[in-house]
């Protein structure tokens, strides 16, 4: 494999994981903060808020997992190495 392609693949894999984690991380923090605020205002709605929060966490975390899949594809099944 060309060393430049190998180095670029490693850098791209690191960027894929790092950048894919920034947005969902900030979103999860914001969502959790608003969920705590909503539960503090309406304690009787805790079950609904918690259910919606966990579902939204799953959707947000899927974006990070997609970044991990791209990084693993670049490292182990590199389409540019040929």
Curated annotation (Swiss-Prot):
InterPro entries: ATP_synth_csu_bac/chlpt, ATP_synth_F0_csu, ATP_synth_F0_csu_DDCD_BS, ATP_synth_F0_csu_sf, ATPase_proteolipid_c-like_dom, F/V-ATP_Csub_sf. The record marks 61 as: Reversibly protonated during proton transport. The keyword Transcription regulation does not apply. Its main location: plastid. Keywords: ATP synthesis, CF(0), Chloroplast, Hydrogen ion transport, Ion transport, Lipid-binding, Membrane, Plastid, Thylakoid, Transmembrane, Transmembrane helix, Transport. SUPFAM superfamilies: F1F0 ATP synthase subunit C (SSF81333). Signal peptide: none annotated. It is a multi-pass membrane protein. It is found in: Plastid, Chloroplast thylakoid membrane. The chain crosses the membrane at residues 3-23, 57-77. Gene3D superfamilies: F1F0 ATP synthase subunit C. The keyword Lyase does not apply. One of its GO terms (cellular component) is proton-transporting ATP synthase complex. CDD domains: ATP-synt_Fo_c_ATPH. It holds the Pfam family ATP-synt_C. F(1)F(0) ATP synthase produces ATP from ADP in the presence of a proton or sodium gradient. F-type ATPases consist of two structural domains, F(1) containing the extramembraneous catalytic core and F(0) containing the membrane proton channel, linked together by a central stalk and a peripheral stalk. During catalysis, ATP synthesis in the catalytic domain of F(1) is coupled via a rotary mechanism of the central stalk subunits to proton translocation. NCBIfam families: ATP_synt_c, PRK07354.1. In plastids the F-type ATPase is also known as CF(1)CF(0). Dicyclohexylcarbodiimide (DCDD) inhibits ATPase. Belongs to the ATPase C chain family. This is ATP synthase subunit c, chloroplastic. It comes from Chlorella vulgaris. The gene is atpH.
């Amino acid at each position: 494999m060309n060393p430049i392609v190998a180095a670029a693949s490693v850098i791209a894999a690191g960027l894929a994981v790092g950048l894919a984690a920034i947005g969902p991380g900030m979103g999860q923090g914001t969502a959790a903060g608003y969920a705590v605020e909503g539960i503090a205002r309406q304690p009787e709605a805790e079950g609904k808020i918690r259910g919606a929060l966990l579902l939204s966490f799953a959707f947000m975390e899927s974006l990070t997992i997609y970044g991990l899949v791209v990084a693993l594809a670049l490292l182990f099944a590199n389409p540019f190495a040929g």
